[in-house]
């Protein structure tokens, strides 16, 4: 993944990317040796995990291929789905955020404003304190019970560990340790384990293709796609979604900035 590089259009280069080679490529550098395993990604003074649209720093990244296009896949409500997997809780096949918004606002039809607000409510409910009477929602009621049990186990054993790989995070390495922080760290750990497995499958599939996976950021995957290989993005989507278990949103564009 790191060796793929991101192609830079020098005409739109704003000076933030310091290291560009003679082929107009700049490279990422992932560090997975963090507390939760969630990789940082900085190289040459550029934090690729924090490239934003507001300052135009994404505008310079384009396809290296003539008539190529950038594709991005983003998981929908990823941590909520990871929690549901832990709880063996069956979520609806429709939008999770829409489903939760209907319960937050007690309405059958959700407005765009309510939908956007529900995402923030869910974020607070998952990582912080309970709002909007979320304890009355079955999914969050079970989530909070799991969180309490996780906290009790962590205090007893001085650690948390992945139920899938048994990777451990010691409490002594966590500053200001709390029930919510422990839960958040577990989700980051499970997110990373899941994504590394998916990336391995994707790289294996793309081994004989010209197209390249060029950037991974938490729940997002960016690809530089050759014009003759657009159809292969369907298989990439299938690998990521795991038969619909983890739906993704697909965006494409000529620049990293203009994805839609």
Regions inferred by a protein language model and the residue ranges of each:
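Active/binding-pocket-proximal capping segment
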Residues: 141-143, 217-218
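Serine-centered coil/turn micro-motif
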Residues: 4, 8, 95, 133-137, ...
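Short, surface-exposed acidic
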Residues: 92, 105-118, 142-152
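Conserved catalytic palm subdomain of right-hand nucleotidyl-transferase polymerases, strongest
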Residues: 64-79, 120-138
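Residues in well-ordered beta-strands of folded domains
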Residues: 40, 123, 249-251
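Acidic, glycine-rich two-metal-ion catalytic cores of nucleic acid-processing enzymes
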Residues: 1-112, 162-206, 210-226, 233-240
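C-terminal polymerase-core module
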Residues: 129-134, 143-186, 224, 228-260
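Amphipathic, charged-and-aliphatic alpha-helical interface segments
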Residues: 87, 112-127
């Amino acid at each position: 993944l790191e060796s793929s590089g991101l192609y830079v259009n020098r005409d739109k280069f704003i000076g933030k990317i310091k290291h560009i080679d003679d082929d107009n490529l700049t490279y990422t550098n992932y560090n997975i040796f963090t507390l939760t395993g969630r990789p940082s990604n900085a190289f040459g003074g550029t934090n690729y995990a924090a490239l934003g649209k507001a300052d135009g720093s994404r505008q310079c990244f384009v396809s290296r291929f003539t008539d190529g296009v950038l594709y991005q896949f983003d998981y929908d409500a990823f941590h909520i789905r990871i929690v549901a997997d832990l709880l063996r809780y069956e979520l609806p096949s429709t939008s999770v955020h829409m489903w939760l918004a209907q319960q937050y606002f007690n309405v059958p039809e959700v407005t765009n404003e309510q939908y956007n607000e529900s995402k923030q409510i869910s974020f607070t409910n998952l990582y912080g304190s309970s709002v909007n009477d979320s304890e009355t929602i079955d999914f969050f009621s079970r989530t909070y019970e799991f969180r309490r049990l996780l906290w009790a186990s962590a205090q007893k054993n001085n650690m948390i560990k992945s139920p899938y790989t048994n990777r451990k995070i010691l409490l002594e390495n966590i500053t200001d340790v709390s029930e919510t922080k422990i839960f958040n760290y577990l989700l980051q750990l499970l997110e990373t384990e899941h994504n590394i497995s998916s990336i391995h499958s994707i790289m294996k599939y793309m081994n004989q293709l010209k197209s390249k996976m060029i950037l991974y950021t938490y729940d997002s995957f960016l690809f530089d796609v050759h014009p003759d290989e657009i159809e292969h993005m369907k298989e990439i989507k299938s690998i990521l979604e795991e038969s619909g278990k983890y739906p993704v949103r697909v965006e494409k564009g000529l620049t990293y900035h203009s994805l839609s």
